[in-house]
A protein has these predicted regions:
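Conserved active-site neighborhood of the chymotrypsin/trypsin-like protease fold
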Residues: 49, 101-184, 188-189, 223
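A conserved glycine-rich beta-strand in the N-terminal activation segment of trypsin-fold
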Residues: 54-63, 79-112, 131-133, 165-167, ...
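Terminal peptide-recognition signature
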Residues: 70-75, 97, 107, 111, ...
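Active-site region of chymotrypsin-like
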Residues: 152-165, 194-254
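C-terminal cap/linker of serine protease catalytic domains
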Residues: 236-285
């Protein structure tokens, strides 16, 4: 009997600790708020941000990214074709994948549908160079998501111990100004890193069969290779996609928020397809 994978479900109305603090502050007298604002402004104006401070901050972010990179693998797909002379050739492509669960002796890897769609062969390469044949657990063509499974026992024990399952965050708590780290393939190469901040969180965005939230961030990403966004706790808050980019915000990276899609990802991980009615809402004036 196989065990099913479950991901925690999040409350859309949940707030981050800092949001809660802000809510409490609004109940205080206006005079206290003004005094606090003046004190903060004075402290910031007198603070000298040195190169050492900057290097220290980037060092911390680099450490978060390197830790998250332990969950990243390379998903290689092979497609049989023929050259101009009719000789058989195999076209291959590399994509980033993130290990999001380990169950029944298998690593379950979240990747992009482009990585496995119509592939004749799938190989997953781990950081030590070990390649393991993978199988598609399920694909969601609407969102461009896919889950690939590989037997964890085929990986050398020492390397298997290094692989870390990437936790899924409560992305409903993400707000503008939060610092994010991009892992996967933000530079177009798997195992690259990038840093940035959330510029805007778009709520109630119309998608097939419902509403979602989209993160916009000033962070380098590559949705063709695959980029996953993690918070400073090292948890995945979303993944980038060109399909969710707004025409009015083309200079920012756009990402689906993970909390909105945990139920779908859970179904894919357990081999079940995601059901859609195909309804896309529209504002009527």
């Amino acid at each position: 009997e196989t065990s099913s994978v479950e991901f925690s479900k999040d409350d859309p109305d949940s707030v981050s600790p800092s949001d809660g603090a802000d809510a409490d502050m609004t109940a205080q007298p206006e005079q206290m708020e003004q005094e606090i604002d003046e004190a903060v402004s004075e402290a910031l104006s007198s603070y000298q941000f040195s190169a050492d401070n900057f290097n220290s901050m980037t060092s911390v972010l680099r450490g978060i990214g390197e830790q998250g990179d332990k969950s990243i693998v390379t998903v290689s797909s092979g497609k049989q074709d023929t050259d101009i002379f009719g000789n058989p050739v195999e076209n291959t492509g590399d994509y980033a994948g993130a290990v999001i669960a380990e169950s029944d002796g298998e690593f379950l890897i979240f990747t992009y549908a482009d990585a496995v769609r119509a592939a004749d062969s799938i190989n997953v390469r781990f950081s030590d160079g070990t390649k393991i044949a993978g199988t598609v657990r399920q694909i969601d063509e609407v969102l461009g998501m896919a889950v690939v499974a590989v037997p964890s026992g085929n990986l050398p024990e020492e390397e298997r111990k290094k692989v870390q399952v990437l936790s899924l965050a409560n992305s409903y708590t993400v707000k503008a100004g939060d610092v994010l780290v991009g892992i996967g393939g933000p530079s177009g190469q798997v195992h690259s890193l990038s840093f940035g901040t959330v510029s805007y969180v778009a709520r109630n965005v119309q998608i097939t069969d419902g509403l979602t939230r989209i993160l916009y961030a000033d962070i380098s990403s590559n949705s063709q290779t695959g980029t996953f966004l993690i918070n400073t706790a090292g948890e995945m808050v979303g993944w980038t996609s060109e399909s969710c980019r707004s025409e009015s915000c083309t200079d920012r990276t756009a990402a689906y928020t993970i909390s909105s899609y945990k139920p779908i990802l859970e179904r894919l991980t357990n081999g079940a397809s995601a059901a859609y009615l195909g309804i896309l809402g529209q504002d009527v004036s």
